[in-house]
Amino acid sequence: TQSLAIIEYLDETQPGPALLPADAVGRARVRAIAQGIACDIHPINNLRVLQYLGGQLGATQEQKDAWYHHWIATGLQGLEAMLAGHPDTDRFCHGDTPTLADCCLVPQLFNARRFNCPLDAYPTLLRIDAACAELPAFQQAAPGAQADAE
């Protein structure tokens, strides 16, 4: 039921390009980036939290948007700092092929755009997101490409 565990399971059991680097240091870095997104940024900005803010706490839409924008900015600032200028950051979060980290980054930026978060302060993240968007696998996984998309 946890996305990172499912992705790692599929990576280990299915043929195709690996989503984790071959070296232990690279794997640790990719996991740190992915977990930073999945464990630090996403949980406080998911739909369940926003519904609780509005329902149980009576937050207005403006207050929920302020919450979302604040926490997304805080998380993306840290992620941009982690990736920008790092010698292993290349076309993607780690190297020149997509990794588990990129699989986490792309949906987080999709959600940030959905909530009209300004993203200009994150040029490294935007560059990586654009590189992912060029790939058929990311195009096919995009929310709008799903059968149940509205």
Roles of regions detected by a PLM:
Residues 16, 81-94, 137-141:
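Surface-exposed helix-capping loop/turn segments at secondary-structure junctions
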Residues 7, 11, 31-34, 76, ...:
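Non-transmembrane alpha-helical segments in soluble domains
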Residues 44, 48, 93-118, 131-134, ...:
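GST superfamily/GST-like fold recognition
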Residues 60-71, 121:
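Residue-level preference for long, well-ordered alpha-helices that form the structural scaffold
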Residues 66-85:
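Amphipathic alpha-helical packing segments from all-alpha helical-bundle domains
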Residues 121-150:
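Long hydrophobic alpha-helical segments typical of transmembrane helices together
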Residues 19-29, 68, 88-101:
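All-alpha amphipathic helical-bundle segments outside canonical DNA-binding/catalytic cores
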Residues 1-63:
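GST-like domain detector, emphasizing the conserved glutathione-binding G-site
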